[in-house]
């Protein structure tokens, strides 16, 4: 027979009910202190791990942050693309191919600040190109096709 004095140890502690008056010991602020972010409900402090050193501070720094806002946005155009535009009659072979023309025809991004011509593919038509940057292979292929190149400074 089990009686109150022979029940044995309690296996778990009873859960404290908070906010049930000051006499309970956990009334009014319910053990949260006074005001501030930690006293409100539903608010967790981001990356806070209870005082333990957070993961982002335990790991070493890696790499660097490139300041991209100071770098020019370069539009890249290959010779094969230019040849395709000429064959499709998007660009006339007599036109001067420059950034203004390519932006007008929406062939490059409107935010581009410089135009670079690369030598991928072949070009058959004579073309006049005005660009900021150009690769050696592109220069060779354009001269071979009889085209002209004008570099902007």
From Swiss-Prot:
Q: Which GO terms describe its cellular component?
A: cytosolic large ribosomal subunit
Q: Give the UniProt keywords, A-Z.
A: Ribonucleoprotein, Ribosomal protein, RNA-binding, rRNA-binding
Check the record and name the Gene3D superfamilies matching this protein.
Answer: 3.100.10.10
- PROSITE patterns in the record: RIBOSOMAL_L15
Annotated GO MF terms: rRNA binding; structural constituent of ribosome
Q: Name one matching Pfam family.
A: Ribosomal_L27A
On the tree of life, the source organism's domain of life is Bacteria
Any GO BP annotation: translation
Query: Can the keyword Amino-acid biosynthesis be found in this entry's annotation?
Result: no
* Xref: InterPro entries: Ribosomal_uL15 (IPR030878), Ribosomal_uL15/eL18 (IPR021131), Ribosomal_uL15/eL18_sf (IPR036227), Ribosomal_uL15_bac-type (IPR005749), Ribosomal_uL15_CS (IPR001196)
| The family this protein is said to belong to | Belongs to the universal ribosomal protein uL15 family.
Could you give the subunit structure recorded for this chain?
Answer: Part of the 50S ribosomal subunit.
Summarizing the function annotation, the protein's role is:
Binds to the 23S rRNA.
UniProt-recorded name of the protein? Large ribosomal subunit protein uL15
Record the organism.
Pelagibacter ubique (strain HTCC1062)
Q: What is the lineage of its organism?
A: Bacteria, Pseudomonadati, Pseudomonadota, Alphaproteobacteria, Candidatus Pelagibacterales
Which gene underlies this protein? rplO
